Amino acid sequence: MKKGTVLNSDISSVISRLGHTDTLVVCDAGLPIPKSATRIDMALTQGVPSFMQVLGVVTNEMQVEAVIIAEEIKQHNPQLHETLLTHLEQLQQHQGNTIEIRYTTHEQFKQQTAESQAVIRSGECSPYANIILCAGVTF
């Protein structure tokens, strides 16, 4: 049995294959996932697992150098936005690097998901609970 934090074989596999600047999406239950994207569906029911639970596990395993978030989260889900910023601040301290935060429109965000190595769908049912993680290097 794998000793690391990620037990899901699909998530573990995609993270291990990421190269520098490759992207990985963690999304809510409602984000449309392009047919061309590898879909890893973790959703069990509404809210399970939560966006932050999935993101926490993924970022424990993945080196992150930048993130892309929909601008709309600031207005339509400010509590999650603050939680997300706190998580990214803690991740920066843990990794020892600065994580660039980029904002884009939700429409542009959806288009960019097609370029990601995979889209991990959570059970989150709150608006704009989506993030694109850009892989960094550990050296």
Swiss-Prot record:
GO terms for biological process: D-ribose catabolic process. GO terms for cellular component: cytosol. Substrate binds at residues 28, 106, 128-130. One of its GO terms (molecular function) is intramolecular lyase activity. InterPro entries: D-ribose_pyranase (IPR023064), RbsD-like_sf (IPR023750), RbsD_FucU (IPR007721). It comes from the Bacteria. Pathway: Carbohydrate metabolism; D-ribose degradation; D-ribose 5-phosphate from beta-D-ribopyranose: step 1/2. Keywords: Carbohydrate metabolism, Cytoplasm, Isomerase. The keyword Disulfide bond does not apply. It catalyses: beta-D-ribopyranose = beta-D-ribofuranose. Its EC number is 5.4.99.62. The keyword Cell membrane does not apply. It holds the Pfam family RbsD_FucU. It is an enzyme of class 5 (isomerase). The active site is at residue 20. Its main location: cytoplasm. It is found in: Cytoplasm. Homodecamer. Catalyzes the interconversion of beta-pyran and beta-furan forms of D-ribose. Belongs to the RbsD / FucU family. RbsD subfamily. This is D-ribose pyranase. It comes from Escherichia coli O81 (strain ED1a). The lineage of its organism: Bacteria, Pseudomonadati, Pseudomonadota, Gammaproteobacteria, Enterobacterales. The gene is rbsD.
